[in-house]
Curated annotation (Swiss-Prot):
Keywords: Cell cycle, Cell division, Cell inner membrane, Cell membrane, Membrane, Transmembrane, Transmembrane helix. Belongs to the ZipA family. PANTHER family: CELL DIVISION PROTEIN ZIPA. The keyword Transmembrane helix applies. Pfam families: ZipA_C (PF04354). It is a single-pass type I membrane protein. One of its GO terms (cellular component) is cell division site. HAMAP family: ZipA. This is Cell division protein ZipA.
Length: 343
């Protein structure tokens, strides 16, 4: 025989053995389960009789004389008092003894009927017949008293509930009288405090703050006599010095060389109307430009003024012109010192 055939036969035999072993073990477990269930059902039947006998309530004979009736009433009252005065551990002990079904083995001799919990609802509905205390004619029927524990318990509650009702009725007229009385005048309601006290400070805040005096510092850069600055040369020189064409159609020198930063000084055309046309600089010409700075200015005024003086000198050098003061005089060292002294 081939080796593969032998291995296949051995595998089939092993599978058959495993299936047979599984079926056999399953049947054995089922048989053990049914045996345990039958034993479990037999135990409650054997233990049910003592509990049934213990749960039978006592039926007193109501036709007994007065002494026997008094003894019966004491027998029902003493277990109740004993159970109320006992500790919580003693109260839970009969409950644990009254459930024998949870134990594997149960001895019927250990059942104590006197420790079973009493049915208090049945005791409350018991009618007790007492003998007549007064001497009456023979043949008079005894008076029957019905004991209702619920009425005795609810009576104090009704009294305590009705007491606040009368007190509330008495308090209502007092409250109405107090409301009708006029409220005493307090110094808070005086008309003097209703006057607008804060009108003067509000008026002071509404007044605009006095504007700071404005001043202009100006320099001229002019071409030589009988000559002019041409547009392309002027635009190139202004771009090299960091000027940007902007508001008012003139060039501005900003604090941070960006349009977002404030302008510190500007350049305007001397000729009217004093503006520039960046798209027509090829045909543009002028005799000079004016550099001016308005005070107060952003940043350090003295540093900004020095920067404007240096820009005027550089612009005159690139265009071949010269710098003049506001009085159209030559801008020399003395004039520069006088300009710096103004800030």
């Amino acid at each position: 025989m081939d080796l593969n055939t032998i291995l296949i036969i051995l595998g089939i035999l092993a599978l058959i053995g495993l299936v047979a072993h599984g079926i056999w073990s399953n049947r054995r477990e089922k048989s053990q389960y049914f045996d345990n269930e039958n034993a479990f059902h037999r135990n409650p039947q054997s233990t049910g009789r003592p509990s049934a006998q213990a749960s039978q309530p006592m039926t007193p004979n109501f036709a007994q004389p007065a002494k026997e009736t008094e003894q019966i009433r004491q027998t029902y009252q003493e277990p109740q008092v004993r159970q109320m005065s006992s500790s919580p551990e003693q109260q839970t002990r009969p409950t644990a003894q009254a459930m024998p079904e949870n134990r594997a083995e149960f001895n019927p001799n250990t059942v104590q009927p006197e420790q079973q919990p009493l049915d208090f609802n049945a005791a409350e509905n018991i009618k007790i017949t007492l003998p007549n205390t007064e001497t009456r004619a023979g043949g008079a029927e005894p008076i029957r008293y019905e004991y209702h524990a619920e009425e005795e318990r609810s009576a104090p509650l009704e009294q305590t509930f009705n007491q606040p009702v009368y007190t509330e009725d008495r308090a209502v007229p007092d409250m109405q009288v107090s409301l009708r009385q006029p409220a005493p005048e307090s110094p808070i309601s005086q008309p003097t405090l209703q006057q607008p006290v804060n009108d003067a400070p509000a008026y002071q805040h509404s007044q605009p703050a006095p504007a700071e005096p404005t001043d202009f510092i100006m320099l001229y850069v002019v071409a030589p006599e009988n000559r002019q600055f041409h547009g392309p040369s002027l635009a190139q020189a202004l771009d090299n010095l960091g000027f940007i064409f902007g508001q008012g159609n003139i060039y501005h020198r900003h604090l941070d060389l960006t349009v977002a930063s404030p302008a510190i000084f500007s350049v305007a055309n001397i000729n009217q109307p004093g503006t520039f046309n960046p798209h027509g600089m090829q045909d543009f010409s002028t005799v000079g430009v004016a550099l001016f700075m308005q005070l107060p200015v952003a940043g350090n005024p003295r540093a900004n003024l020095k920067m404007m003086i240096q820009a005027a000198k550089n612009l005159a050098s690139q265009l071949g012109g010269f710098v003049l003061t506001e009085q159209q005089e030559e801008f020399d060292v003395m004039a520069e010192a006088a300009y710096l002294a103004r800030v």
